[in-house]
């Protein structure tokens, strides 16, 4: 792997300001999903190492929360600058371990850095309240304080941004945090904490442990010193973690599964809708929680949309992420390929037609053809399962009422998208869609200033925006006799 700064490729975990191996000496292999090439190893840590990281976070808490918001912001600002200074190396590292095209990886690094910059400033704006007292001899105040020791479990699909979106608000609020990155993509996390150390974040304030997810997760959810857990991943795992946190009444933030609908109304700009559909479906090979699962297209424009959409999808270039011109990289694992294949087989067995793709790519390995299916009917698994692959399912509809009902017919409620030029319809539909985020005439909705999160079984809490820091704060009421 060609990096300008080779020290960014760390093959040890980071606990209490020290780079360390697992107590057992065991390691996990990290492979390039595009080629299968071995990239390196990281420690296979477990319960004992997780406890040490949590204890270090507890020991570092008093000093870190005792610093002014401005002091913490200065360090976070330096971390932000270092992320941008090393963006090319960080992007190359991400592409090799995660598989996404290099231009997408670079975009993610900049996106990740934006959360650090944003929350460095938001930490200075954690305002309290003065409450008009019902008694002349009392003064009533509200202050906000960091919740304490936090833990975070992050996914492989956005291995940098999902870390900074959790770590930056925690540190800005005066909390300390321990992160467990996905075993598929630990090198991005370790590079981030390397730069955080260079920025001056003190020992114990931000640690990264790699290895046995159940063993580490059990300490993250069960250790009495941990006051908050943040998790991005599947709904079943989120449900499990939430249950484990209940024993010690921890605060939880959960960004879980999605089943995003994309609605094209009869008055939509079809070219714009196709462009938005490509972004919302095929970014990261369809492996994002806000990727579209279900395309609902009005009957009057269905053929026109489908034809143009297939033309554009056919032109997408599939290949290794570090190959120039690549638009779709590999899926993360053989298991992911098998899941996509299974969903397509289920749909075609039940009457769906393949307009494009539908099988493993000629490149072999974990590459899969960009796929478009039509004749989708109720009962097909891909209408209810999160696909997490480059498969688009097209469904006809005729009325607004019908499509709103179809769009909401899921346990999930993360993101939804629709295209319409009727302003009254825009407000009417947006308000009735049961989702935490709605993209209107756009397929790209996420940024650092907007609240990211879902409803129903897509999670709890919001990340990013002015609301993102609130999940790391406790409200304290002060009553002063005068």
Q: Where are these predicted regions, by residue range?
A:
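ALDH superfamily catalytic-core signature
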Residues: 236-373, 377, 440
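Hydrophobic face of amphipathic alpha-helices that form TPR/SEL1-like repeat modules
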Residues: 1-34
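Short, well-ordered beta-strand elements within core beta-sheets of diverse protein domains
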Residues: 38-45, 60-66, 152, 262-265, ...
